[in-house]
Structures are given as C-alpha cells and as structure tokens.
UniProtKB/Swiss-Prot annotation:
This is tRNA pseudouridine synthase B. It holds the Pfam family TruB-C_2. Belongs to the pseudouridine synthase TruB family. Type 1 subfamily. PANTHER family: PSEUDOURIDYLATE SYNTHASE TRUB1, TRNA-PSEUDOURIDINE SYNTHASE. It catalyses: uridine(55) in tRNA = pseudouridine(55) in tRNA. It comes from Trichodesmium erythraeum (strain IMS101).
C-alpha cells in the first residue's frame, strides 16, 4: 500500500500522534506527514504511506489557513495553549487600526518563530529548551505570505479578528498573531487555527479519523495516488531502454523529444515509462555543457 491520505487533523493531537494512529489503523510502519500542525490546530495534514514517504519533500509548499487573533493577551507559546504573561483590555482597538498595519505582513517578511516550536537550535528543538526553562536566541528567517485578508471582526475588551492567510512553508501563524499585537502595541495571541489547504490538499476533500475507520471497516478505504499529489511537477516519458538505465541510477543526456524547456534546469520532474508507469522523480542538472536527467527518487524497478 502506497499513496497519500488527506487527513483532517483533530484538535489535541500532535502531528506525530496522527502518524502513529495511521500506522496502527493501516498496520504499516512506513508512514510520515507533510508539514507539522500545532496540537491545538485542526485541518489538513498530508500523510504519506509506503514509498510515498520518500516523496514528501517534493510536495508543493503553499499552505492556507483560517486563524483567529485575540488582542490584549500575550502568552508564552503565542497561542492560548500557553501561560498568559500579560492581559490588559483594549476596548479602544478598532478594525481600521488592524487594516492599516496588515499590509506589513504581506510578501517576504522577517519572522522569529515562536520559542515553543519544533525548530532546532544547536541540535535541540526549541520547545524542549523552553520546557527546560532555557532561553536561547531564536534566529530570524524570511518567510513569504502570499495573501492575508480580514474575514470577521469582533470588538470588545479583548477583541478578535478572523484572518485568511495563504503562505509558503515555514510560516508560523502564531508568530503573525504575536507580531500583529506587537505592531499595534497591545499584544496579541492566536486563539484558533485551521489549515484549509496544504501542499495541494484541501480541507473539503479531507477525511477525519472516524471516516477513515468507517471506510476501513467497510473495505472502502483507499489512498490518493502519488501522481495526484505530484501533479504540479512536469512530466518526462522515457523509452524502455532509457527507463531501465535511469532506474538503475544512470544519468541520461537531455533529449529534444522530451519537449522540456531547458530553462527548467534544476527543476524536478515526474518520470514515466512508455507504459505509463510512474518511475520516480528526476532532476535536470547541468554537467559542463550538457543537461542530464538525474534520478532523485526511484520508486519503480
């Protein structure tokens, strides 16, 4: 069994918990996930099964979220799961105040990940260091936000705004909530988060654990094909002899009949044989004056 499961992660489970449960349900060891979701968050968590685990790195990086930011509160984790370190009513905050600063969070921005996160500093995960009471400097990094817009607004002593955010990999919505509060000089934290899209998978087509279990009991469960998950990658088709050589690890000289733009050098491709069998992922690389199709991940023999 190999392919992808578009899992709708429930609140209260870590991404690792979800992988462990899928292993148990499918009675398979080779299972991995395509992008960590915080325990409190819900929504799309791509799960790879079997040989598909080798292809997680090739999934598209774009993600989309619905998130709620609560103002007037600062926590240790930048969400409501952490300890509240500051709480002060801000009834004077207006929607127009948020609208003025929101463009600052669009495009390529500098972001400091939350101190409670899976990022490693000197070989240790930040959340482990934070739980030990150790303070370390979290390195700033560049992330990209493609779109951010306001969905709803609720005024009050601790007002809330609902946001729709589309972003690239590595972007922490908790950090956006924290920094939005800082920009307004009132504090802010993430109150709720749902990932509605991740790596080409969408929430409307996702399955809950209950649905997976029911389908398994009724013998109706099936994984999404590898080709569906990698549909964003262009295709190269090899003749039988070339396919055999490529699957054995040989690099193949570029061929005009592949009809691939040479400017796509260094890009990844889905590689098939003439029978339509998916062979794996290849990459066009430059070697002196030549272009070569190098195997990156070989799935089929």
């Amino acid at each position: 069994m190999q392919g992808f499961l578009n899992l709708n992660k429930p609140s209260g489970m870590t991404s690792h918990d979800c992988v462990a449960k899928v292993r148990k349900l499918l009675r398979l060891k080779r299972v991995g996930h395509g992008g960590t979701l915080d325990p409190a968050a819900t929504g799309v968590l791509p799960i790879a099964v079997g040989k598909a685990t080798r292809l997680l790195q090739f999934l598209p990086s774009e993600k989309a979220y619905f998130g709620t930011v609560k103002f007037g509160i600062i926590t240790t984790t930048d969400d409501l799961e952490g300890e509240i370190v500051q709480s002060a009513p801000v009834p004077e905050l207006m929607l127009s105040d948020i609208e003025k600063v929101l463009p600052n969070f669009l495009g390529k921005i500098e972001q400091v990940p939350p101190s409670y996160s899976a990022i490693q500093v000197e070989g240790k995960r930040l959340y482990d260091l934070a739980r030990q009471g150790k303070t370390v400097e979290v390195p700033t990094r560049i992330v990209e936000v493609f779109n951010i817009k306001i969905l709803d607004w609720r005024s009050g002593d601790f007002p809330e705004v609902d946001l729709a955010i589309a972003c690239g990999t590595g972007t922490y919505i908790r950090a956006i909530a924290r920094d939005l509060g800082r920009t307004l000089s009132i504090g802010g934290t993430l109150a709720a988060l749902t990932r509605i899209e991740s790596s080409g998978f969408s929430e409307e087509n996702s399955l809950t654990f209950a649905e997976v279990e029911n389908q398994l009991q009724e013998n109706k469960f099936s994984l999404l094909s590898i080709e569906i998950a990698l549909a964003h990658l262009p295709v190269i088709v090899l003749i039988t002899e070339d396919a055999k050589r490529w699957c054995q690890g040989q690099r193949l000289p570029y061929q005009v009949k592949w009809q691939i733009e040479t400017k796509k050098a260094e890009h990844y491709f889905r590689v098939y044989n003439y029978k339509g069998d998916f062979l794996g992922i290849g990459q066009l690389i430059k070697s002196e004056e030549n272009l070569l199709l190098a195997p990156q991940v070989v799935i089929s023999n």
